[in-house]
């Protein structure tokens, strides 16, 4: 006996949606063995891919000629995951042997999935250093579907400056319709099909197929719908969608269905019961509140007419009616497939109190496709009204709660102009015929327009939110950190108090060197989303700067226990051992992070800094160059190269690399400070002072900038100005031995020996063990007159060694060295 394709497909998607990947793979293999079709091939490859076996999906699809857009896209996705970028590009856009496809060609070929295809192609272009082409693909993808976030995020990360106001908007109604899957169209039953009895060739229900009737087809998400081979389809296609049918076969499955009384409260989109903690508002005003005495509006159906969708465009059928007495809708953008409730169509709530016009569910994936769209895979098999349903009628009826009597409600015309008939306690509707339509004067245009307007309003609300988040993220990627903090802090509280938003704010504080604030924000992220790994590498570096070894140890332990395949976890572990000056162990952990994700630029940068601490400068250079190869806009790597060249006294190269980092992050006072020091080393003292002044304007309390400006003033024999600068610096870092040592040098030049000796003594008291040998050596010889003794190059003030080898433990002392070491 030939395996029926549709019920098997339904079972496979049921298993996939319940994460039973082994079962899904097994059934998909059986289906593909039975039916060698592109559809079965795609379904099997999807099972492999979702179960984490991308290589299996790749080899399966590679071994067969993929002609459908779904197979091509999945094969390209596998290629990208397996780092076969050239092959993935050829599949999507053609190659050397094929004609290169334009964006319009891709849109024509891939249809609704073109936005995802272009986003994937843009990723390939960016990974192969063709940023201009990648940018075009991302922009086209966003123009097709402004609901996508990752293309916008990628545009910001490659240095583009997309306008969120122009990106997250609908350019036309067609653009709005294309953004939504076919299943998001509002349902309105068509009375013209109410008497249609679908025929079936299945005259008997075998015992082994009864269990198939028990499948909860609501879990089959409509976005996975495939074109079904007509030769395998035995049942009429113009019947109800499985999204509206929870159990069983035929129209009798809706008999004696009971709907719960909607709770009184604010109604946003689909009736009084629609409001829940999961109901997004997205800027939509709540409708009027129903009175506490509302009836339950229950209705029992013994022979419910089939339900279809009204197309999004074109005039509705004259006999289309609004179904009476449905429960409230699920929340907007809710996931289908996890509920056994019957999907509501159009709920109208009546009460003696304030009149409430409840509206259809909006943008919910649980609503069925329009009639002009292809039916779902399994929609035809489970909707027969033949004798096969009688065998299971008793069993099916037991799955519903007992019938609850309805309360009487008056017939009243609501704001939408829809008149509903009286509902009696014992009323059972067997048929909606033309007499009901003519007597009730039911209008179909108003609910459709109302539903569409609410759909668009909900989408516009989301667009408004994305615009604000986009502005904040764009400002952060442009390193306008204060602006980013201001924008993101004004988001609604329920969006502000989420891990993603708080991580961006914490990163902004980190870039501003406000480590205490960053630590506060990241600790809040850990409290509300202790499962979040993304962004924790920045948190670990923040704790490294603050020298909070206990908190850093706890963080690294938790992250590595939670996800050993996360580069962020190993970066945190490396920072933990780096803080303990266990540099060899830290290097191993950073190398492990690179092994887990070879495209993780931050791990290369941390490893490079660690090699600098162990004086392995050649290895450090290689690490920083690899970080730049992975991400050319990773300014920390450019800074690391400049720091190494400075240590090697290659000042021109150092200035060039520092300047490159500054071009990426023009708001960094630390980078300006280092450029000023290099300029002074190149005998450009006046230019160096100007650069340091700019750095202090950006961050007036940056101790590193003030210390270097005082040092340059001292070297230029401007002793009084240097002394004034150092006195201000002493208020910021009162326990920094270097400050007192330089003050002593100034007093010595001014001839005030007793004050010089006093400050030298304080410097030694702050560093009694001599861990800071720079008290005698760290002031660069270029800062000193010719009569001063030379010092060794290794102990220059710019070196990272002093920040790690310093004996400072107080929080005030760490500010100078934390900022001085590097920004990471």
Swiss-Prot record:
Q: Which SMART domains match?
A: TPR
Biased composition of type Polar residues is found at: 326-341, 362-371, 380-390
PROSITE patterns linked: TPR, TPR_REGION
Q: Give the residue ranges for region: Disordered.
A: 287-422, 781-824
Q: Where is the composition biased (Low complexity)?
A: 348-361
Signal peptide range equals none
Where, per UniProt, does this protein localize? Answer: Nucleus; Cytoplasm, Cytoskeleton, Spindle
Keywords per UniProt: Cytoplasm, Cytoskeleton, Nucleus, Phosphoprotein, Repeat, TPR repeat, Ubl conjugation pathway
Q: Which InterPro entries match?
A: TPR-like_helical_dom_sf, TPR_rpt
Which residues are annotated as modified residue Phosphothreonine in the UniProt record? 205, 209, 244, 313, 366, 430, 446
GO BP, sorted A to Z? anaphase-promoting complex-dependent catabolic process; cell division; metaphase/anaphase transition of mitotic cell cycle; neuron projection development; protein branched polyubiquitination; protein K11-linked ubiquitination; protein K48-linked ubiquitination; protein ubiquitination
Its biological purpose is as follows:
Component of the anaphase promoting complex/cyclosome (APC/C), a cell cycle-regulated E3 ubiquitin ligase that controls progression through mitosis and the G1 phase of the cell cycle. The APC/C complex acts by mediating ubiquitination and subsequent degradation of target proteins: it mainly mediates the formation of 'Lys-11'-linked polyubiquitin chains and, to a lower extent, the formation of 'Lys-48'- and 'Lys-63'-linked polyubiquitin chains. The APC/C complex catalyzes assembly of branched 'Lys-11'-/'Lys-48'-linked branched ubiquitin chains on target proteins.
Query: How does it associate, per the subunit comment?
Result: Homodimer. The mammalian APC/C is composed at least of 14 distinct subunits ANAPC1, ANAPC2, CDC27/APC3, ANAPC4, ANAPC5, CDC16/APC6, ANAPC7, CDC23/APC8, ANAPC10, ANAPC11, CDC26/APC12, ANAPC13, ANAPC15 and ANAPC16 that assemble into a complex of at least 19 chains with a combined molecular mass of around 1.2 MDa; APC/C interacts with FZR1 and FBXO5. Interacts with RB. Interacts with FAM168B/MANI. Interacts with MCPH1.
Protein name according to UniProt:
Cell division cycle protein 27 homolog
Give the organism, scientific name: Homo sapiens (Human)
């Amino acid at each position: 006996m030939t395996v029926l394709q549709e019920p098997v497909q339904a079972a496979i998607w049921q298993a996939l949606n319940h994460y039973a990947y082994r079962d899904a793979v097994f059934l998909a293999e059986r289906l593909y063995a039975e039916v060698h079709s592109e559809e079965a091939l795609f379904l099997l490859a999807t099972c492999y891919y979702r179960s984490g076996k991308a290589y299996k999906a790749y080899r399966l699809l590679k071994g067969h000629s993929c002609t459908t857009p779904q197979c091509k896209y999945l094969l390209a996705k596998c290629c990208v995951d397996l780092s076969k970028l050239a092959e993935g590009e050829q599949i999507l856009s053609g190659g050397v042997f094929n004609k290169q496809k334009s964006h319009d060609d891709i849109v024509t070929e891939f249809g609704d999935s073109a936005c995802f295809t272009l986003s994937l192609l843009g990723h390939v272009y960016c990974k192969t250093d063709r940023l201009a082409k990648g940018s075009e693909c991302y922009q086209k993808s966003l123009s097709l579907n402004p609901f996508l976030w990752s293309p916008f995020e990628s545009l910001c990360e490659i240095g583009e400056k997309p306008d969120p106001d122009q990106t997250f908007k609908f350019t036309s109604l067609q653009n709005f319709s294309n953004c939504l899957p076919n299943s998001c169209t509002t349902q309105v039953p068509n009375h013209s099909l109410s008497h249609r009895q679908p025929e079936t060739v299945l005259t008997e229900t075998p015992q082994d197929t009864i269990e198939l009737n028990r499948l909860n087809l609501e879990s089959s998400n409509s976005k996975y719908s495939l074109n079904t081979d007509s030769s395998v389809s035995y049942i009429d296609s113009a019947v109800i969608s499985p999204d509206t049918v929870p159990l069983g076969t035929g129209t009798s499955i809706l008999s004696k269905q009971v709907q719960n009384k909607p709770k009184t409260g604010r109604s946003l989109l689909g009736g009084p019961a629609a409001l829940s903690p999961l109901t997004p508002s997205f800027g939509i005003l709540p409708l009027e509140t129903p009175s506490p005495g509302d009836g339950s509006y229950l209705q029992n159906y013994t022979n419910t007419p089939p339900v279809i969708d009204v197309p999004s465009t074109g005039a509705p059928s004259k006999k289309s009616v609004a179904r009476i007495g449905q429960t409230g809708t699920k929340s907007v953008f809710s996931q289908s497939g996890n509920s056994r409730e019957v999907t509501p169509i159009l709920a109208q709530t009546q009460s003696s109190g304030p009149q409430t016009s409840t509206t259809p569910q909006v943008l919910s994936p649980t609503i069925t496709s329009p009639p002009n769209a292809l039916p779902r895979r399994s929609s035809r098999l489970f909707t027969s009204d033949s004798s096969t349903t009688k065998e299971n009628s008793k069993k099916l009826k037991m799955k519903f709660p007992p019938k609850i009597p309805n309360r009487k409600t008056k017939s009243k015309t609501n704001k939408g102009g829809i008149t509903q008939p009286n509902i009696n306690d014992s009323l059972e509707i067997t048929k909606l015929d033309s007499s009901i339509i003519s007597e009730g004067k039911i209008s179909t245009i108003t609910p459709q327009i109302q539903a569409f307007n609410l759909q668009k309003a909900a989408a516009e609300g989301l667009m408004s939110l994305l615009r604000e988040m986009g502005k904040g993220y764009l400002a952060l990627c442009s390193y306008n950190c204060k602006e980013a903090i201001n924008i993101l802090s004004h988001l609604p509280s329920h969006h502000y108090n989420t891990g993603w938003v708080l991580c961006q704010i914490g990163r902004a504080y980190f870039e501003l060197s406000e480590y205490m604030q960053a630590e506060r924000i990241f600790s809040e992220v850990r409290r509300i989303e202790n499962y979040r790994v993304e962004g924790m590498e920045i948190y670990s570096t923040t704790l490294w700067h603050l020298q909070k070894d206990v908190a850093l140890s706890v963080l690294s332990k938790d992250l590595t226990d939670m996800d050993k395949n996360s580069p962020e976890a190993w970066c945190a572990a490396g920072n933990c051992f780096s803080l303990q000056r266990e540099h060899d162990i830290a290097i191993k952990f950073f190398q492990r992070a690179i092994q887990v994700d070879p495209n993780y630029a931050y791990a290369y940068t941390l490893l490079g800094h660690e090699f600098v601490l162990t004086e392995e400068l050649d290895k450090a250079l290689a690490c920083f160059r690899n970080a730049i190869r992975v991400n050319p806009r990773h300014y920390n790597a450019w800074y690391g190269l400049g720091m190494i060249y400075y240590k090697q006294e290659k000042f021109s190269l150092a200035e060039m690399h520092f300047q490159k980092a500054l071009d990426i992050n023009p708001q960094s006072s630390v980078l300006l400070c280092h450029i000023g020091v290099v300029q002074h080393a190149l005998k450009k003292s006046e230019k160096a002072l100007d650069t340091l002044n700019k750095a202090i304007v950006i961050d007036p309390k940056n101790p590193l900038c003030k210390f270097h400006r005082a040092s340059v003033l001292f070297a230029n024999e401007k002793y009084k100005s240097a002394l004034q600068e150092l006195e201000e610096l002493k208020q910021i870092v009162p326990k920094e031995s270097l400050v007192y040592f330089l003050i002593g040098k100034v007093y010595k030049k001014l001839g005030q020996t007793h004050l010089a000796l006093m400050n030298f003594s304080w410097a030694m008291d702050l560093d009694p063990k001599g861990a800071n040998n720079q008290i005698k050596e760290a002031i660069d010889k270029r800062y000193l007159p010719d009569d001063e003794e030379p010092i060794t190059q290794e102990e220059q003030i710019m070196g990272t060694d002093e920040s790690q080898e310093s004996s400072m433990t107080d929080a005030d002392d760490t500010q100078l060295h934390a900022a001085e070491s590097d920004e990471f």
